[in-house]
């Protein structure tokens, strides 16, 4: 859950 680089790692959810 990298909120700083959420576009880099493959996350199941996007915490914007």
Swiss-Prot record:
Keyword Transcription in record: no
Protein name: Antifungal protein 2 small subunit
An annotated GO BP: killing of cells of another organism
Signal peptide extent: none
Organism: Malva parviflora
Subunit structure: Heterodimer of a large and a small subunit.
Functional note: Possesses antifungal activity against P.infestans but not F.graminearum.
Note: Antimicrobial activity is not affected by salt concentration.
Keyword Disulfide bond: no
